[in-house]
Amino acid sequence: MATKIRLKRQGKKFYAFYRVVVVDSRKKRDGKVIEEIGTYNPNTQPSTIQIKSDRAQYWLGVGAQPSEPVFKLLNITGDWQKYKGLEGAEGTLKTVEAGPDAEARIAAVENQAQKLKAAKAEAAAKAKAEAEAAAAAEEAPAEEAAEEAPAED
């Protein structure tokens, strides 16, 4: 059986991602596959390439021919160099640098929440103090008016 390692298209219009599959060369592009050996998502930065190296080595060893796009992916991951016994078997796959630690992000969010709570409490205390001052100011003129008025006997 003539086998090929090629891409099977998934996803929706204008947002395709692919599965790297081993398939009989006479089957349709998205037809029945023998084995799925990886995925490729060109929509992420950098592109996500995940290929099961041992399975790719096996299928290359038994004569499966990679398509041109899969050949390029195998070169990037270093699987083709391993199969051929060439230098550079570690591949040139780029990885996303790890962002800030999750715990650090959680701590930052909690710190910001504490600041917001403190600001709200301070604003509420200030509003309460102003309300009390206004109430005291209203009572003071009422008392002065009572003192100034002549007492009725």
From Swiss-Prot:
It comes from the Bacteria. GO terms for biological process: translation. Coiled coil: none annotated. Residues 121-131 have a biased composition (Basic and acidic residues). Residues 140-153 have a biased composition (Acidic residues). Gene3D superfamilies: 3.30.1320.10. PROSITE patterns: RIBOSOMAL_S16 (PS00732). Residues 121-153 are annotated as: Disordered. GO terms for cellular component: cytoplasm; small ribosomal subunit. GO terms for molecular function: structural constituent of ribosome. Keywords: Ribonucleoprotein, Ribosomal protein. Belongs to the bacterial ribosomal protein bS16 family. This is Small ribosomal subunit protein bS16. It comes from Bifidobacterium longum (strain DJO10A). The gene is rpsP.
